[in-house]
């Protein structure tokens, strides 16, 4: 990542799919200590998915290490482990849809339902600095054609 993990103050997670959430434990392993903002449903899904992913990482690394050692090569380390996943989970901050949340000094966010997955959100971010407010919007993935979602 081009920015040191310990220089990041907050992460805004649009949904739990592993291509969006899967490297959060690695971010923590690398020094991230900020907050991870997501909807409550996304937080709940991440609690399952990130621990499962960490177990897979550990098992895969053990298997590759056994194979590598037979070939006289170095042990393989997992990208992250269950301790890293647990660290990421402790940083999750559940947000309600349509509620304004102060994420940091001068930063307010609001998550709105975007219909992609249970708990998915479009994230509006208001940045206030020197009396000027700017609005940014992160869409994440949008919609899910012909796949109704039961509201959380």
Identify the residue ranges that each predicted region occupies.
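His/Asp/Glu-rich metal-coordinating catalytic cores
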Residues: 1-12, 17-21, 27-152
